[in-house]
Amino acid sequence: MKNTNWFKDAIIYQIYPRSFKDSDNDGMGDIKGIIEKLDYLKELGINCVWLSPVYESPMDDNGYDISDYKKIYSTFGTMEDFDLMLSEMHKRGIRLIMDLVANHTSDEHYWFKESKKSKDNPYRDYYIWKDKPNNWTGFFGEKAWEYDETTDSYYLHLFGKKQPDVNWENELVRKEYKDIIKFWLDKGVDGFRCDVINLISKDQRYKNGLNPLILVGKKYYINGPRLHEYLNEINRDVLSNYDCMTVGETVFSTLDDIKLLTKEDRNELSMVFNFDHTSVDNYLGVKWLMRKFSLKRFKKTLDKYQYGLKDEGWNSLFYENHDQRRSVGRFNTDDDKYRVESAKLLATTMYFLKGTPFIYQGQEIGMTNMQVNSLDDFIDIETINVRKTMNKLPLTKKYIDKSIKNGSRDNSRVPMHWDDSEYAGFSNSKPWLKVNENKSFINVKQSQNDPSSILNYYKKLIKVYKEYGDIVRDGIYKDLLPNDKKLFTYERRLGDKILLVVSNFSNSNIKCDILDNYKEFNKEVLLNNYDNESNELKPYQSILYYLSK
């Protein structure tokens, strides 16, 4: 089947199922809850959903620890519920991509239960076992090896100890994942978001790492020697037979890495999630090590990939997901007075770059980070482990508290605010994670009734995006003021047609005469988060112009 590259025209909405909508009032979101809200998504204007894991799981890491790839977690529903959801999405012109977690499974998966029984078990080499561990550490701040007394051996886990890494060197493992991918594509699923996909190949020497601080040994397990071979094999043997897309989560990858992963004729991934732009307010790409946001640094990072992938590869455009904190209050937009304006500014600035937009649930109404009274309110496994690690370091309590509050994955996992009722319309029972008090004024129902709301701005933005899709998809990008510390101004040019974005990332009025450079063009304002339009931009004002001859 010919791949139509439909992902280049997609507007993708991420659903984190346990926090989206609870249909049976058990405090946990579910598939029937998603079905209830499909008309809302259709009205928003998106045309694809990325669904975080709904597979069978003990939920040690909220579904990223899978015990059966071909079953649905019972709290989320049944396979019949899933099939109905997929059918109802397709009826509304909405495609579905699923999370594919292929670097690790749950330790409760049948493969691992067998693997740990004995050294000569047929499933032994499905995982990575060593008689002695090296010094690698993983992404949750722990040692990356866990001792198992049954066979007096250690298994590798780059995430939680209940998430053992699978051994992609084993051809049987690769066959298993091809079969899993085919199973879901045959159901009609439209593609996959591939979780930490650039970790699947490890350097087989298993050398000790040199970095004494974080992710010890990462040079030996990130972008490993056979990564491209494995991805090409999966594409050749399975994906190429379907009109589907893949987006890879590729941590700590460079521009050159991403070119290799996404260049069309290499047949590996459609695009990747690159996190450089979400790391401009931290050190070393580690969200817990905070530093002040710099717009100049932010632009430089985005420019690198806009220019670097213009002729080869493809960009993903995002601020938020289930691992990132909320964008409102971040990226120099932490002035509560301008919460609405800054949310609109962020949307306009990001989504007219070249690439595929990803919107995370609640982002379209300006949901904020989790409101906590104590660090004990955070229940995420990563947060708990990192907090333990930070408490052992020579850091002040104030710094640790701020880091945990800003960095916790729970920030984006607060249940969706549908209305201002006790549990925000998410459920009639106490949710698995508490809702925010600001549900009283940040919720879908109120947003739908307010013409100037963030939600209605997103709807308008998506309509504009579709109407000017040729420029958005193919227009040449140029950053017009790369060294300006407060303004982000860029153009997308396609022949004599230009989309011009002018954004003020500050809480003060700023004069901007950029339009003087386009006097020979006819001017039309397509989007504006204020009622006025002049060469003096108001705080957090963002304007999208259409210029034509």
Where are these regions (language model features)?
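Beta-strand-rich binding/interaction modules
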Residues: 509-528
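C-terminal beta-strand-rich structural cap/linker in extracellular carbohydrate-active enzymes
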Residues: 533-549
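Hydrophobic residues within beta-strands of alpha/beta enzymes
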Residues: 49, 192-194
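Loop/helix patches that line or flank the sugar-binding groove of alpha-linked glycan CAZymes
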Residues: 6-7, 229-232, 238-241, 245, ...
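Short catalytic/ligand-binding loop motif for oxyanion handling, primarily in non-cytosolic enzymes
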Residues: 24, 57-61, 104-111, 200-203, ...
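Active-site clefts of carbohydrate-active enzymes
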Residues: 216, 315-335
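Acidic/aromatic-lined carbohydrate-recognition and catalytic surfaces
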Residues: 2-182, 186, 199-254, 264, ...
